[in-house]
From Swiss-Prot:
Function: Catalyzes the conversion of geranylgeranyl diphosphate (GGPP) to the gibberellin precursor ent-copalyl diphosphate (CPP).
Top-level taxon of origin: Eukaryota
One GO cellular component term noted in the UniProt record for this chain: chloroplast
Enzyme Commission number, as recorded: 5.5.1.13
Presequence boundaries: 1-47
Cofactor(s), by name: Mg(2+)
Name of the protein described by the UniProt record: Ent-copalyl diphosphate synthase, chloroplastic
Organism encoding this protein: Salvia miltiorrhiza
Gene expressing this chain: CPS5
Residues that coordinate or bind Mg(2+): D372, D374
Motif range (DXDD motif): 372-375
Pathway: Plant hormone biosynthesis; gibberellin biosynthesis
Gene3D superfamilies according to UniProt: 1.50.10.160, Farnesyl Diphosphate Synthase, Terpene synthase, N-terminal domain
Length: 793
């Protein structure tokens, strides 16, 4: 018995815990989905992508697939902890202010880079060119004598920052007390270098630290230079320097320009031709400061002077970071489920990125001659989602011999770079082979890292990177319902505790901050409280309509509402959400009740066609329940928006009833219901005739119905192992191709296009079918409990 004939049917009690097979998909070497063994409630989808929820606070037990809720506890808890509405408004205003004030990027100061700037002498050579940098160093030493990130202790970060600051102060014979404390910290802790996780080694650390030690020796600073950890660092340095192609370094822009301060034998006349437009060397203050020391170049001086003014004496480890900030802020807000509050600001962020998009990709800053796969993948994904035309061929610049890389010549692969490539590759259009290859490569890389428990990244120390990667691998984008992703990301996002790794640890306050997280938690709990009230209303409607007498279980009821609420969660979309849920519930009831009787089907259709309003006001028949529900939905829309949808809605049902015998048509009815019930909220009312005659509407409907029908038939033709038989007739390649075509229709814009919400409705319905086909019943039960009933703490 399949999970469901459509994505709104819940398993009966015998299968609520996964006793019967449910198919799972896994990505094949060709980049498409293939059938594999069924998932169980303890399989990777449930255990790796998502941790066990704290459902004991709200759920006694799952009986017959239905969470038994302690409603009184929820009500009391809400009353105690609910924040006032003005708190949400206050947080929205604060976040909006951040987004509107975005410029070159908000970023923390790097003591290491500031020290290199402080080392620069003026034209006469006997005074510091930038005394404000020395002042910053002198006023930002930590209590233990070190310099570095105040909240996260990394010995890599503390040692290189502290040694650089000690060197800078000593070179100008300033603050001997502070240098003494710094030296003591280094002596006490330098042995810990061998204990640190090498994945968190800062950029260029193995070259920069030995260079600083050499300078320290010249200044007669007494620090250890022969510990086991340092010997390993020096060995890494030799390997890296041998890999550096001197001719290429001086001929074309490479990532080596970011770390010039650690390299010997540089030919500055050639290197100056490779400066960025802003006068920097690949946006690195320390590299640029070293260049200024060696060349006295005016453009280097101008770059550093401008940023010293902005940061009041300090400098970051990299600047600007405008594209990085714009992209990652949008990504975080979307995944946290609060992007709807900031649509104008998000549109501006995405438009800003598009202004600097190139056919070779982008990096963290505008107008760069160097591109990286991380920023390019994030940019590609968000631009495509927002309707911009971006070619998948951009990823050909990051592929060689079937492998993908972040930078040419990189020494190690970053987990987050491959993670964002994997996410981007799922927005594939038909025929984009490069994205199939990218998905295959990145998925394999991430799966191997997960299997080896190596999901650490060289660019960020975050709260739960394994959870983020696990969710992406186990719940592909086609199956990822918005509220499900948000519910788990709320536990994975670390807010201001997440810290990035560059030449030193650094923070991006407009990307990682607690205001985003606090707003998202409040918003989620507010939406969840509304959903729980709607669920109680659905239960009351179910009882009053006697749907249980017609064979509909309460398990089917909760899944129908859950799928709708997890897809359309916004409070202002309550009417669409309830219309989706009730439509799905009635379809399931009618289909199952008349499954074995063709004569009963004909009678039902005849009664529906010839029904008059008064006759069915109180009768407890399926026809009566259906007519009363349509009347109520239509009346709700009329009162709220002044739109008459009763006849079009009844027409849609009539079409479905005539065709349901073949098992199809459910997706079309759901889409039509959503578009009719949601039309009143848009700026203009889209009539049934206008919608149905629009060429793109017809294409979207055909694509949606086609792929949903394949997914429905796929579920019905699984064999006892949860896998398709050889003659099943449904190729997963066809389903993937159908989803790709639908995504292209939904996200691309054209003259005279449909309203974006109408287009999104098609994808939401297809995604719900995909979700039902992909997830096993145990996982769905788990999601229901967590998304609908587990409050975010």
């Amino acid at each position: 018995m399949p999970l469901a004939s459509n994505p709104v049917a819940f398993l009966p009690s015998s299968t609520a815990h996964g006793d019967l097979p449910a198919a799972a998909f896994s990505r094949s070497s060709a980049g498409c989905l293939q059938l594999c063994r069924p998932l169980t409630p303890t399989s990777s989808l449930q255990c790796n992508a998502i941790s066990r929820p704290r459902t004991e606070e709200y759920i006694d037990v799952i009986q017959n697939g239905l969470p038994v809720i302690k409603w009184h506890e929820i009500v009391e808890d809400d009353a105690e902890k609910d924040s006032p509405k003005d708190k949400v408004g206050e947080l929205r205003d604060a976040v909006r202010s951040m987004l509107r004030s975005m410029g070159d990027g908000e970023i923390s100061i790097s003591p290491y880079d500031t020290a290199w700037v402080a080392l620069v002498a003026d034209a006469d050579g006997d005074r510091p060119q930038f005394p404000s940098s020395l002042h910053w160093i002198s006023t930002n030493q930590l209590a233990d004598g070190s310099w570095g990130d105040h909240a996260t202790f990394s010995i890599f970060d503390r040692i290189i920052n502290t040694l650089a600051c000690v060197v800078a102060l000593t070179s100008w014979d300033l603050h001997p007390d502070k240098t003494h404390k710094g030296i003591l910290f280094i002596k006490k802790n330098i042995h810990r270098l061998e204990e640190e996780n090498v994945e968190h080694m800062p950029i260029g650390f193995e070259v920069a630290l030995p260079s600083l030690i050499d300078i320290a020796k010249q200044l007669q600073i007494d620090i250890p230079s022969d510990t086991r950890g340092l010997r390993e660092i020096y060995a890494r340095r030799e390997i890296k320097l041998k890999k550096i192609p001197s001719d290429i370094l001086h001929q074309m822009p490479t990532t080596l320009l970011h770390s010039l301060e650690g390299m010997p034998g540089l030919m500055w006349q050639k290197l100056l031709k490779l400066q960025s437009e802003d006068g920097s060397f690949l946006f690195s203050p320390s590299s640029t400061a070293f260049a200024l020391q060696q060349t006295k170049d005016h453009n280097c001086l101008k770059y550093l002077t401008n940023h010293l003014i902005k940061f009041k004496g300090g400098v970051p480890n990299v600047y600007p970071v405008d594209l990085f900030e714009h992209l990652w802020a949008v990504d975080r807000l979307q995944r946290l489920g609060v992007s709807r509050y900031f649509q104008p600001e998000i549109e501006e962020c995405v438009a800003y990125v598009y202004r600097y998009w190139t056919e070779k990709g982008i990096c963290w800053a505008r107008n760069s001659e160097i591109q990286d796969i991380d920023d390019t993948a994030m940019g590609f994904r968000l631009l495509r989602l927002h309707g911009y035309e971006v070619s998948a061929d951009v990823f050909k610049h990051f592929e060689s011999g079937g492998e993908f890389f972040c930078f040419k010549g990189q020494s190690t692969q970053a987990v987050t770079g491959m993670y964002n490539l994997y996410r981007a590759a799922q927005l594939i259009f038909p025929g984009e082979n490069i994205l199939e290859d990218a998905a295959t490569f990145s998925a394999k890389f991430l799966q191997q890292k997960r299997a080896n428990n190596e999901l650490l990244d060289k660019w960020i120390i975050t709260k739960d990177l394994p959870g983020e990667v696990g969710y992406a691998l186990d719940v592909p984008w086609y199956a990822s319902l918005p509220r499900v992703e948000t519910r788990f990301y709320l536990e994975q996002y670390g807010g201001e505790d997440d810290v990035w790794i560059g030449k030193t640890l650094y923070r991006m306050p407009y990307v990682n901050n607690n205001k985003y997280l606090e707003l998202a938690k409040l918003d989620y709990n507010n939406c969840q409280a509304l959903h729980q009230q709607e669920w109680k209303d659905i239960q009351k409607w179910y009882r009053n309509s006697s749907l249980g007498e017609f064979g509909l279980s309460e398990g089917s009821l909760v899944q129908a509402y859950y799928v709708a609420a997890a897809s359309i969660f916004e409070p202002q979309k309550s009417q669409e959400r309830l219309a989706w849920a009730k439509t799905a519930i009635l379809m399931q009831t009618i289909t199952s009740h008349f499954h074995h009787s063709a004569e009963q089907k004909r009678v039902f259709l005849h009664e529906f066609q010839h029904a008059t309003g008064g006759r069915y006001k109180t009768t407890r028949t399926l026809v009566g329940t259906l007519l009363r529900t349509l009347n109520q939905l239509s009346l709700d829309i009329l009162l709220a928006h002044g739109c008459h949808i009763h006849q079009p809605l009844k027409n849609a049902w009539h079409k479905w009833i005539k065709t349901w015998e073949g098992g199809g048509g459910g997706a079309e009815l759901l889409v039509q219901t959503l578009n009719l019930c949601g039309g009143g909220r848009r700026n203009r009312w889209e009539s049934e005739e206008l919608l149905s005659s629009h060429p793109k509407y017809e294409h979207l409907l055909k694509a949606t119905v086609g792929v949903c029908d394949k997914l429905r038939r796929f579920q019905h033709r699984k064999d006892c192992n949860g896998c398709m038989g050889s003659d099943g007739g449904i190729r997963m390649l066809d389903i993937e191709a159908g989803m790709q075509e639908l995504v292209k229709l939904v996200v691309t814009k054209s003259p005279g296009d449909l309203d974006s919400e109408i287009k999104q409705n098609f994808f939401m319905i297809a995604r719900s079918y995909y979700y039902a086909a992909y997830c096993n019943p145990g996982t769905i039960n788990f999601h229901i409990a967590k998304v609908l009933f587990e409050r975010v703490q």
